[in-house]
Regions:
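Conserved small/polar residues in nucleotide/adenosyl-binding loops
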Residues: 1-5, 209-211
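Active-site-proximal cofactor/substrate-binding loop regions of enzyme domains
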Residues: 4-18, 23
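Short glycine-rich anion-binding loops that position phosphate/pyrophosphate groups of nucleotides
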Residues: 11-14, 130, 159-160, 195
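Short, acidic/small-residue loops that bind anionic groups at enzyme active sites
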Residues: 23-43, 51-57
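A short helix->loop->beta-strand "cap" motif at the edges of active sites that frequently abuts
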Residues: 26-30, 49-50, 151-152, 184-187
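Conserved anion/nucleotide-ligand pocket segment
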Residues: 50-107, 111
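Internal helical hairpin/lid segments
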Residues: 117-174
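ATP/nucleoside-binding phosphotransfer catalytic cores, i.e., glycine-rich phosphate-binding loops
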Residues: 158, 162-208
Length: 211
């Protein structure tokens, strides 16, 4: 009998990357979480296992709207949820492995052995509480690593609180940073997806999707 993992994370925060210093015996099944859980989702995906779901935590699931809870149920039971709606910039359509992540956590995984294959992938990013200049710094790091240039498509979820508490270091807006750092990639880009640190955090399967 094959014992399958069915892991739903209670909360995010910090520290999940420390677990990657150990050899995690991933098994088939599914893993649910987001934010700091990006580290575990990516490690599992790099190990060649499907079933990762970037979605609500146990501590936030009860506050999710009905459509979000139903979407998660559909994914857990092998049903196909409806397509998400965002704001496309430019045109085009692409198909590739779907990867979702918190931008800050994923940025600190670059260069490690826990980064899934990015070539041709569709990457969905979200974050919370990071000033636009920090978002710019991280996306520039991705570009310097050649990571953004490998993608087949990119989607931006919610960057909650990332345009608040503006200070003297702010010389641009979040919107301008996201546009400028992806403008020359010549791939489909979608913004304002209902994904991230919001009530209405749409679950995403780490699988195939069109944008």
């Amino acid at each position: 009998m094959c014992i399958r993992d069915r892991l739903a994370c209670a909360r995010g925060g910090w520290g999940s990357a420390r677990l990657l210093e150990r050899s995690i015996p991933w098994k088939p099944g599914w893993l649910l979480g987001f934010s700091d859980i990006t580290s575990l989702l990516w490690s599992r995906l790099k190990a060649g296992l499907a079933g990762g779901i970037h979605g609500p935590l146990l501590t936030t699931l009860g506050a999710e709207p009905a459509w979000s809870q139903e979407r998660l149920r559909q994914l857990l039971f092998g049903e196909t949820p409806p397509a998400l709606k965002g704001e496309p910039r430019g045109g085009g359509q692409t198909t590739g492995p779907l990867i979702a992540a918190n931008l800050t956590v994923a940025s600190h995984l670059l260069g490690s052995d826990h980064v899934p294959e990015l070539q041709g992938a569709i990457l969905i990013l979200e974050d919370v509480g990071e000033a636009p200049y920090r978002i710019d710094r991280m996306l520039t790091h991705w570009r310097l690593c050649g990571a953004l240039q490998q993608l087949g498509g990119i989607g931006f979820g919610q960057f909650e609180g990332c345009d608040r508490n503006l200070d003297d270091l702010l010389t641009t807006t979040l919107e301008a940073v996201l546009d400028e750092r992806t403008a020359d990639l010549n791939i489909p880009v979608v913004k304002n997806l209902p994904v991230g640190h919001i009530c209405g955090n749409a679950a995403l399967p780490l699988s195939l999707i069109h944008i």
